[in-house]
Amino acid sequence: MQFHVQETMSKGIKAKIDENLDVSALFKDRSDVISHGPLHVSLQVTGNEGSITVEGELTIDWELACSRCLDPVKLHTVIPVSDQFKPASEKDGEETEEDEDDDVIAVTGDRLDLKPYVEEVLQLFMPFAPLCSKDCKGLCQNCGQNLNEQKCGCSTERIDPRMAVLKDLFKDEQ
């Protein structure tokens, strides 16, 4: 997934990337990712005059822990990709207004490696708080019972900790 920047732009090269990428290293220290398949990369790379356009999609099947009850959640995620890459200007190492364009990714050097870019896009689109269902009740804060399976016998009365002293005061008067 590497391209020569100048050659791709000057010759107007069009290339199709259709491969599976092993992303195990990205998730090895993450306890919320139970399992995952390979990342399927399907991209069209087009060299234009002065830029390289990358369009397509990333697809992954993974199993994540529900953020409320910790049950496994199987997800099929399709991530649309559409970005433009341009060579960075080399004027004393300072960025010009042209380089500060938010829609363009600056490339330093003559090689464009799309693997780090694809991995970053995957991490940015990873679900922040996956849920097994919209109405997931989560775990009991006192005993840890999964409230989706059954109710626990814990008290649901909540007392503001700042007022707990007053509660004890009224008990003594009775």
Which sequence ranges carry the predicted segments?
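Structured interface patches
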Residues: 1-174
